[in-house]
């Protein structure tokens, strides 16, 4: 692969520039960014919210604290590598189903029985009611003794690379059928009400309470969460992108040439990017989570718009205006798949992949090379230097 890529040593690591992309990179007239893992380090917010949500559901149901270590980050990253898990609600949901099917049969039976007697609309009321019927249904040392087994099951399942939430759900149902517990799993699926709107949808309510915290949650939903959380995990986010980088890119490309195509909500993006948002063209910003809330949180309605479908990238490019060569900067499989899908509609997109905040750097670099990314860079802050180099300005 070395001939296909020219390498450039930078302070933060090595950049790879695809040899046949030089001319296209030189003529770039816009750059559109993904947020998480590119502009914002969201590992301590989104990843943590997935784990806390699953922990909350199972600790409440079983009356036994589920250690966070039972839900390995590796399982989350494995699902994301497939390219079909752009919404962390999906990841949370799948992990919850896998855990449920691996709990002892007697507990699953007790849950099914309890669930039949519950008809509460509101997710957290349902959870409380189920919990009240399930005390002492699981040995008190269950998670202590079986935590390692559950963790391994999650890693194994996610390594099987289900392509999206629906594929994962089918696999889990099939395996539950083999184990003879499919009816219990169906009761659990119904209990989570994942295809319903808030406040019925348990995953969205619990996840968003942990992620946003009470104040932003209320701003988003218009009602208060019944789950008491002091501060949202969004407060733990850190910026990756610097103002210096955005300034340099604006100078290179001109005013209004930077856009966003992200799965985030505008609320979460504003909260963390703050004033830096002013560097982006307001017409060229697409927030898929906003669209999801507008559609009442409905999974089936949002599916045609979600990455790797090209909607957000095409829409952001159209918002920027007259563009002939657009670089999309992402950090995952779904980002490059989206670029590829957008090119089948309008052949104007190049992909740049950022790898430095990945836990498996070499794996992701290989993934991007295999996807023929135009650029592979440590972080977004290396972009001005690499673009300068390609344009023949070998910045010091």
Task: Identify what each model region corresponds to.
Residues 287, 374-383:
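Short acidic-hydrophobic, aromatic-tinged amphipathic segments that line or gate anion-handling sites
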Residues 383-394:
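Short amphipathic alpha-helix with an adjacent loop that forms part of the alpha/beta core around
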Residues 50-185:
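Conserved phosphoryl-transfer catalytic core
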Residues 274, 328-378:
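Acidic, Mg2+-coordinating phosphoryl-transfer loop and its flanking beta/alpha structural elements
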Residues 22, 58-64, 102-104, 249-251, ...:
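Alpha-helix termini
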Residues 223-250, 257-327, 333-344:
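Substrate-recognition "cap/lid" segment bordering the active-site pocket of phosphatases
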Residues 18-22, 27, 32, 133-147, ...:
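Short, acidic loop-to-helix structural element flanking the phosphoryl-transfer center
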Residues 4-74, 90-93:
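Active-site neighborhood of HAD-like aspartate-dependent phosphohydrolases
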């Amino acid at each position: 692969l070395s001939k296909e890529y020219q390498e450039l040593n930078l302070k933060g690591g090595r950049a790879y520039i695809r040899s046949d992309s030089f001319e296209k990179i030189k003529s770039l007239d816009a750059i559109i960014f993904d947020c998480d893992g590119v502009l914002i380090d969201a590992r301590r917010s989104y990843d943590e919210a997935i784990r806390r949500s699953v922990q909350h559901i199972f600790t409440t149901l079983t009356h036994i604290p589920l250690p966070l270590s039972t839900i390995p980050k590796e399982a989350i990253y494995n699902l994301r590598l497939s390219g079909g898990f752009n919404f962390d609600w999906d990841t949370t949901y799948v992990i919850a189903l896998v855990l449920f099917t691996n709990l002892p049969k007697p507990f699953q039976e007790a849950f099914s029985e309890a669930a039949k007697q519950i008809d509460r609309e509101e997710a957290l009321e349902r959870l409380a009611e189920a919990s009240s019927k399930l005390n002492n249904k699981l040995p008190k040392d269950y998670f202590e003794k079986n935590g390692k087994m559950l963790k391994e099951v999650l890693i194994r399942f996610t390594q099987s690379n289900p392509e999206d939430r629906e594929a994962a759900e089918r696999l889990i149902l099939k395996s539950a059928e083999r184990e003879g517990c499919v009816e219990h799993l169906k009761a659990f699926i119904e209990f989570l009400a994942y295809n319903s709107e808030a406040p019925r949808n348990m995953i969205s309510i619990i996840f968003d309470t942990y992620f946003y915290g009470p104040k932003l949650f209320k701003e988003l939903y218009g009602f208060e969460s019944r789950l008491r959380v002091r501060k949202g995990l969004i407060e733990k986010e850190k910026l990756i992108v610097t103002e210096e980088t955005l300034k340099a890119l604006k100078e290179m490309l001109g005013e209004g040439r930077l856009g966003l195509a992200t799965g985030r909500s505008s609320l979460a993006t504003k909260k963390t990017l703050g004033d830096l948002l002013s560097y982006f063209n307001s017409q060229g910003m697409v927030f898929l989570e906003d669209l999801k809330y507008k559609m009442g949180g409905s999974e089936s309605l949002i599916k045609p718009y979600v990455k790797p479908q090209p909607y957000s990238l095409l829409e952001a490019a159209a918002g920027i205006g007259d563009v002939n060569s657009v670089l999309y900067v992402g950090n995952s499989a779904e980002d490059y798949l989206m670029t590829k899908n957008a090119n089948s509609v309008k052949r104007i997109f190049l992909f740049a992949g950022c790898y430095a905040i990945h836990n498996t750097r070499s794996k992701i670099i290989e993934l991007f090379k295999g996807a023929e990314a135009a650029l592979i860079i440590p972080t977004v802050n290396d972009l001005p230097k690499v673009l300068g180099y390609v344009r023949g300005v070998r910045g010091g």
